[in-house]
């Protein structure tokens, strides 16, 4: 089965082709026009998707060494995301499916991230056999979920305010770093001391290390942003510039340590021995390293996506569509799917 995946939920325009469960192409174009504004401008994002989507899809099909007539199914992000951006990819995908008279599969962007760690040579043979705890962390979402083998899942924790990725970007902006600041902080922090300044770690407690922890798995990062801003305002420009790497490392520790502690506590409290991390922030080297070390101590198997699959991409859209179809979802020629902006967790991905 040949599946075309399309992703346009934010500021990446992507097309990918999956042939018999294997990724044959994954073309991604990241929009650079937003850097000047220090964040994604929704209207600009929509216009860029509209400008690029035809060439991106053509490139994905060509790279896969097939033609559009060889496609069996088309899948696209239906949400959550910037509503205008989602509409571009969704309408294009539905129109293309209608023209080719093939089924269309709408895909939830966050659910696709959850399964992105299993995009390998054969994603279905690398999927965990039992339940796993998924940390999905990006610029717009921070979710902790328990995923069952039948693809049913429940969200057990989420951010109450800002996502972890937003915390990276906004605190980085306070340090004068370019957008997106997350990767810059990651690189800068390699030269810094994470214990230079202890910023607050909200909604954490020593009780989370308990095997019987039954507390709150929610996250909060707005307080961290306020704390960083207040602390920086008390320092001189020379001090900040001289210790920029140390400050970046301290900010990164405050975010990463909370993500790791809550994920491990969730797995431990439920007796689950498999954990995955996904989303743009899963590319952070400190998060990968800390989660790997924590999982090793606990005897937990860690699933992490390749860095190319951490950020938004269409390969994860096509992969989840293929996984749904392999689990019995009926693909239909339905072209009236409406886009949606927010994430509402369902009980089953299929």
UniProtKB/Swiss-Prot annotation:
It comes from Pelodictyon phaeoclathratiforme (strain DSM 5477 / BU-1). The keyword Cytoplasm applies. It comes from the Bacteria. The gene is tsaD. HAMAP family: TsaD. Required for the formation of a threonylcarbamoyl group on adenosine at position 37 (t(6)A37) in tRNAs that read codons beginning with adenine. Is involved in the transfer of the threonylcarbamoyl moiety of threonylcarbamoyl-AMP (TC-AMP) to the N6 group of A37, together with TsaE and TsaB. TsaD likely plays a direct catalytic role in this reaction. Keywords: Acyltransferase, Cytoplasm, Iron, Metal-binding, Transferase, tRNA processing. It catalyses: L-threonylcarbamoyladenylate + adenosine(37) in tRNA = N(6)-L-threonylcarbamoyladenosine(37) in tRNA + AMP + H(+). This is tRNA N6-adenosine threonylcarbamoyltransferase. Fe cation binds at residues 109, 113, 312. Its EC number is 2.3.1.234. Substrate binds at residues 136-140, 169, 182, 186, 284. One of its GO terms (biological process) is tRNA threonylcarbamoyladenosine modification. Binds 1 Fe(2+) ion per subunit.
């Amino acid at each position: 089965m040949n599946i075309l995946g399309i992703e346009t939920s934010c500021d990446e325009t992507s097309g990918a082709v999956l042939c018999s469960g294997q990724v044959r192409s994954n073309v991604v174009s990241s929009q650079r026009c937003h850097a000047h504004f220090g964040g994604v401008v929704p209207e600009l994002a929509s216009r860029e998707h509209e400008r690029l989507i035809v060439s991106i899809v053509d490139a994905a099909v060509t790279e896969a060494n097939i033609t559009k007539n060889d496609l069996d199914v088309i899948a696209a992000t239906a949400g959550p995301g910037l509503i205008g951006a989602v509409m571009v990819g969704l309408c294009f995908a539905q129109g293309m499916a209608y023209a080719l008279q093939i089924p269309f599969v709408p895909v939830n962007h966050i659910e696709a991230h959850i399964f992105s760690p299993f995009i390998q040579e054969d994603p279905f043979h690398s999927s965990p056999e039992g339940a796993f705890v998924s940390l999905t962390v990006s610029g717009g979402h921070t979710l902790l979920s328990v995923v069952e083998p039948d693809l049913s899942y429940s969200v057990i924790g989420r951010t109450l305010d800002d996502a972890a990725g937003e915390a990276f970007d906004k605190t980085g902006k306070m340090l004068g770093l370019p957008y997106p600041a997350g990767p810059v902080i990651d690189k800068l922090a390699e030269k810094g001391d994470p214990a230079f300044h202890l910023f607050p770690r909200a909604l954490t407690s020593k009780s989370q290390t308990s095997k019987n922890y039954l507390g709150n798995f929610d996250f909060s990062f707005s307080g961290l942003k306020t704390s960083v801003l207040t602390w920086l305002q008390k320092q001189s420009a020379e001090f900040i510039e001289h210790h920029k790497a140390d400050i970046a490392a301290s900010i990164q520790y405050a975010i990463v340590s909370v993500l790791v502690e809550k994920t491990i506590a969730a797995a431990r409290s439920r007796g689950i021995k498999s954990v995955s991390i996904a989303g743009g922030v899963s590319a952070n080297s400190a998060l990968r390293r800390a989660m790997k070390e924590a999982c090793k101590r606990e005897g937990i198997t860690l699933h992490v996506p390749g860095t190319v699959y951490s950020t938004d991409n269409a390969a994860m859209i096509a992969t989840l569509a293929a996984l749904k179809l392999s689990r019995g979802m009926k693909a239909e020629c339905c072209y009236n799917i409406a886009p949606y902006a927010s994430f509402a967790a369902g009980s089953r991905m299929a």
